[in-house]
Structures are given as structure tokens and as C-alpha cells.
């Protein structure tokens, strides 16, 4: 599909407003359930097709998605911002409907599993994550599933690869050095496609990289990551880990 053609690039400005109030109920000491309301409004302007043949007429339409969402999670992480042990299993489902004010009817199923394993060597951590974002219905352009950015497969410009379905896996070794210094090494793969049945090993997007960590206060790191992806590189400066 056009999502995967490197030449099909469009430059544009993008404005977004979103709100997602949610009520959470603790089920037990490791689990939560939640129900919420999700509102997203997006508009694009100043389009430049950069000599590509892509039809961007859909992007010229503002998008409004309004719906209900439901969350379930199971969380045994020892520290949410920078875990060294435990796991997180989370399912977030969204149901957007025109009778609630949405322009179209569609659903989003966002699934995530993360695990953190302490390593004997100097409190190092092996972390890994599997994530999928599956959609169904008349999905507007701004609600397509994306890969890239500082957490969803570093190295790719977020939004460059987007489609109705997304699947990714990533693993990271977090190494403590002397004092408050540390390093990380990671690799990951991801895919986007129109339908789940269209996922193909021919369309795998690889990512790998190295990062430096500085502990500004206990269990809170500044991170600098250099990521290498397919025909792209990325540099990221953030607080706390990618996942």
C-alpha cells in the first residue's frame, strides 16, 4: 500500500486537541478497571506534496473522534516510572460513535504486555514489550495506528508508517555503570498493515540503538538515545524509559 512507499511523503502542519477523562476502580492490589470518555480533534494545513503523487484530500478534512473507552490492567511492576522487576498487561478498547458526536463509527483495541527482569550483574535489567493496536471500521487519518517516536520503535519519524493495524516487539538491556551513569542497548521490529491478514515479514520495520542514562534522582533517569531504523536515524532526549 502507499503507506510503505518511501517516496510518498507529504509535508504539512498539524493541530490536535484531545481529552480523555477516566474513572478507575481498583479490583485488587495488582489490577484496575476503568471507563472513560475520549475526544480527539485534528486538522491539517499548509500541505506540500513534495513532488509525490499521493492524494492528500482526506487530510484536508478535519477529524473528530468521540467515544467511550474501557481499560483493564494487571500490574506487578515495582516502580512505574522505571521498573526493575514485574510485568504489565493492559487492554484499552475504544468505541467511537456518531451518536456521541464522532464523525465516523470505528473501534480501537490497544493491547500491551511488558516484562522487566532483574539481572544479577550490578542491578541490570532486561526489559521487553509486545504491543498491538488494531482498529475496525471507518478510521479517520489521525486515528490510524502508528509506529515511531520515542517509545513506539525508536528511529522512525512517528506517523511516517501508519495503517489500520500495528504490531511491534522490542527488547532492551539496561546496564548500570559507575555512580549515576548507565547505558542501554535495544532492538525491535514492527509492522503496519490494512488488515491483520496482510501482516508480512516482507514489511518488517527494524530498529536498534544505544543510549546513555543519567540518574537525576533515585529511579528517575534522563535518557539520550541514538536509534537506527530502516533508512532513518533518530536522536531522543527524554525523562524515564521508553517503556
Language-model segments: which ranges?
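Gram-negative/organellar outer-membrane beta-barrel architecture
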Residues: 1-64, 69, 162-163, 221-222, ...
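Residues on the lipid-exposed face of transmembrane beta-strands in outer-membrane beta-barrel proteins
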Residues: 19-25, 37, 70-74, 111-115, ...
